[in-house]
Design a protein with these regions (language model features):
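Conserved catalytic alpha/beta core of Sir2/sirtuin-type deacylases, generalized to analogous enzyme cores
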Residues: 4-13, 45, 104, 108-112, ...
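A short acidic, amphipathic alpha-helical/loop segment
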Residues: 2-8, 68-72, 182
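Active-site diphosphate/adenylate-binding microenvironment
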Residues: 135-213
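Electropositive phosphate-/nucleotide-binding environments in soluble metabolic enzymes
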Residues: 3, 40-43, 97-104, 120-124, ...
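Short, functional N-terminal and low-complexity linear motifs
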Residues: 13-18, 74-80, 145-151, 197-201
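Anionic-ligand anchoring segments at beta-strand to alpha-helix junctions in alpha/beta enzyme folds, i.e.
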Residues: 1-56, 186-213
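Glycine-rich, acidic loop regions that bind phosphate or pyrophosphate groups
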Residues: 23-142
Length: 213
């Protein structure tokens, strides 16, 4: 329920935001400050901006190894963390300045404090550039096609027998990222989607978009 409040907060103070697996759809994917999934299974846009951030506000996040890339994602020498969480245990992670409470109420209170100080982030065109790079990558991923013996999967470290064997057994030749892009185009905008294990959840965090909360 805090998604719209978070969006307005980011708009007012020019703060970009990334999404965790659990947080996807809380905010609109089309929002100009949304960078998509963050962390090990995240997007280029989210991770390149997070890498140099000097302050990270984690709203409702457990700050897991996937989200933080085992604490290696945020590489600014003086990076500080602010956590907003209704679970005290998670709020205390990353040696953060912590607020234990409701996300919507806490973000609203934080906005009032920043507004009083006349705060705005120092970003200029970094956000737009990062999003543009990722948009091109999304198009590439959606267009990957199986071309036969000369096909080169995205993942290079693999058993070379796997893809030919899969095609032989199933006659399936659509790639996972292309399939997700096709499903996104075809299903209802407000449909709920459930994924299994393996590489699918990571692809979903990267390439799945939705504006329905």
């Amino acid at each position: 329920e805090a998604g719209e409040t978070v969006e307005k907060f980011c708009e007012e103070f020019k703060i970009p935001f990334g999404e965790t697996q659990a947080g996807k759809s809380a905010c609109k994917s089309s929002h100009p400050y949304c960078l998509g999934g963050i962390g090990v299974t995240g997007t280029y846009a989210s991770n390149v901006i997070a890498k140099d951030a000097d302050v990270v506000i984690a709203i409702g996040s457990r700050m897991s190894d996937f989200t933080t890339s085992s604490k290696r994602l945020y590489q600014h020498e003086g990076v500080k963390f602010v956590t907003i969480n209704n679970c005290r245990y998670h709020a205390y992670k990353m040696d953060a300045v912590k607020a234990v409470g409701d996300a919507k109420a806490t973000v609203t209170a934080l906005a009032a404090k920043l507004r009083a100080k006349g705060y705005a982030s120092a970003y200029t065109d970094e956000i737009a550039k990062a999003k543009a790079v990722w948009d091109e990558e999304m198009k590439r991923l959606a267009g990957i096609e199986y071309t036969g013996d000369d096909f080169e999967p995205i993942i290079k470290a693999r058993d070379p027998r796997t893809v030919p064997e899969f095609v032989k057994l199933t006659d399936g030749k659509i790639t996972q990222t292309a399939a997700l892009a096709a499903i996104r185009r075809c299903i209802d905008a407000d449909a709920n989607i459930i994924t299994a294990g393996g590489s699918l959840p990571s692809c979903m965090q990267r390439v799945w978009t939705t504006d329905k909360r």
